């Protein structure tokens, strides 16, 4: 089937390849600015939420174009590995509706709700891309240790309480997506 799969978040402002630029494992292909230190780069990346303000966002237009093109499904990145949530999650403030994100003052700042609503009205199958890794969560990438590859940066068997906190966090976010946004046909 022909469909529409969208990766979109604060990283789009800089033209970054999703959140891969903050993972040291992928430095060979991500074209990250290596003039500054990783720590400075990471801080700058996380602060992109403070300038993310997609005021021209028009979900009805997107859905109309997709329908006109003959698409049958829509999958949206609810959260990529960087942990930035494009919905009004209760689990973190690293989200589109955060008071630090200028878009939170928009009439309908929950981008996921607006997108899913527009595509559901047009009878699209709906998909939620949800990244289990969350590099912004202190229970995935702990500040106690250096960020490394794409995986948790601690030994789970030595810190089971941290992993349990992360599992609860993940469960709660998926529950929000499955219960607050209408029928979701695909979890990616």
State where each predicted segment sits.
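Mature catalytic domains of secreted/periplasmic carbohydrate-active enzymes
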Residues: 1-188
């Amino acid at each position: 089937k022909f469909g529409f799969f969208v990766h979109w978040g604060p990283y789009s402002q800089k033209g970054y390849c999703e959140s891969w630029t903050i993972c040291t494992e992928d430095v060979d292909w991500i074209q990250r600015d290596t003039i500054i230190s990783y720590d400075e780069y990471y801080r700058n990346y996380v602060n992109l939420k403070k300038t993310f303000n997609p005021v021209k966002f028009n979900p009805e237009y997107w859905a109309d174009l997709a329908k006109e093109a003959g698409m049958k499904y829509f999958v949206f990145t609810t959260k990529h590995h960087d942990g930035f949530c494009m919905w009004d999650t209760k689990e973190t403030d690293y989200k589109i509706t955060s008071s630090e994100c200028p878009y939170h003052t928009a009439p309908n700042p929950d981008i996921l709700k607006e997108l899913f609503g527009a595509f559901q009205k047009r009878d699209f199958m709906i998909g939620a891309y949800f990244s289990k890794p969350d590099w912004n969560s202190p229970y995935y990438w702990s500040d106690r240790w250096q960020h490394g590859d794409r995986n948790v940066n601690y030994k789970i068997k030595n810190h089971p309480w941290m992993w349990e906190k992360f599992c609860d966090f993940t469960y709660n976010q998926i529950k929000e997506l499955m219960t607050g946004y209408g029928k979701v046909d695909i979890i990616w």
